[in-house]
Amino acid sequence: MEIIRLPAFNDNYIFLLVDRATGDCAVVDPGDAKVVLEYLSKEDLTLKTILITHHHADHVGGNRQLLSHFPAAAVYGSEIDLQKRRIPGQTVSLKAGNHLDLFNRTVEILFVPGHTQGHIAYYFPPLQPEDSGDLFCGDTLFANGCGRLLEGTPAQLFASLQQICDLPDNTNIWCAHEYTLKNIKFSLTVDPENEALQRRFQQVQTQRQRQKPTIPTVLALEKQTNPFLRCSDRQLQANLKTTDPLRVFTKLRGKRDLF
């Protein structure tokens, strides 16, 4: 399976999962149908599957147009979003623990509420022990950040991020926005002593100056530099004047909202 990253809007990423042997593909969170259709036409690919992490327009806005070109494509999303009819064209309901088979890969469904109540993520475990898995997590975990609390509670999003932390450290994190540089600038205000974070800031500055994407990130790097995954770190707790990890997380999210 080949993963193609398609930029959309100002800072979104849409991901195509391509089986070159068959010419079939899936798309994750197609907020903009135009960029997807252009790539499919250029590469002569057939869209079979639409995977949605959550219902926001910049993640589902292209569904109807894609289905007009590929009416047989299945649209996957959470059971909560299906109940609320929030995902255009949704045909399949998913919940925590469900599994899919896609291009000879198993896909595990994680329920990761917080940003929205129905948010899910798609985890592709590695085929071989030495390989890396892939997580498509929408707006739950970002490179050096996390999603805003638009429908859920701090405790929900904190628990969702802990789920992600339980995945193997070499997991590739395919999040849906290019927010990395601003996230790192914020992180430095709350975790300035973090040398790994300082190094990452220099690297990401260079990448963005060259208009290079910073996605995917890797879970191990997030555990070293992302304050939202470091709420048990003693230095970060001292900086935020609390030893309660959930309270650290809640303070971080509030500060990031105002940054």
From Swiss-Prot:
UniProt-listed CDD domains: hydroxyacylglutathione_hydrolase_MBL-fold (cd07723)
The reaction(s) this protein catalyses: an S-(2-hydroxyacyl)glutathione + H2O = a 2-hydroxy carboxylate + glutathione + H(+)
Required co-factors: Zn(2+)
Binding site for Zn(2+) 1: 54, 56, 115, 139
UniProt GO molecular function: hydroxyacylglutathione hydrolase activity; metal ion binding
Residue stretches in coiled coil: none
Keyword hit for DNA repair: no
Top-level taxon of origin: Bacteria
Amino-acid positions noted as binding Zn(2+) 2 in the UniProt annotation, renumbered to this chain: 58-59, 139, 177
Entries under Gene3D superfamilies matching the protein: Ribonuclease Z/Hydroxyacylglutathione hydrolase-like (3.60.15.10)
Entry keyword annotation includes Metal-binding: yes
Catalytic EC class: hydrolase
Pathway recorded for this protein: Secondary metabolite metabolism; methylglyoxal degradation; (R)-lactate from methylglyoxal: step 2/2
GO process terms (BP): methylglyoxal catabolic process to D-lactate via S-lactoyl-glutathione
Keywords: Hydrolase, Metal-binding, Zinc
Cofactor note text: Binds 2 Zn(2+) ions per subunit.
InterPro entries hit by this protein: Clx_II_MBL, Glyoxalase_II_hydrolase, HAGH_C, Hydroxyacylglutathione_Hdrlase, Metallo-B-lactamas, RibonucZ/Hydroxyglut_hydro
Any one Pfam family match given in the protein's UniProt record, by short name: HAGH_C
This enzyme's EC code(s): 3.1.2.6
Role according to the record: Thiolesterase that catalyzes the hydrolysis of S-D-lactoyl-glutathione to form glutathione and D-lactic acid.
UniProt record similarity statement: Belongs to the metallo-beta-lactamase superfamily. Glyoxalase II family.
Subunit structure: Monomer.
Record-given protein name: Hydroxyacylglutathione hydrolase
Organism: Picosynechococcus sp. (strain ATCC 27264 / PCC 7002 / PR-6) (Agmenellum quadruplicatum)
Gene: gloB
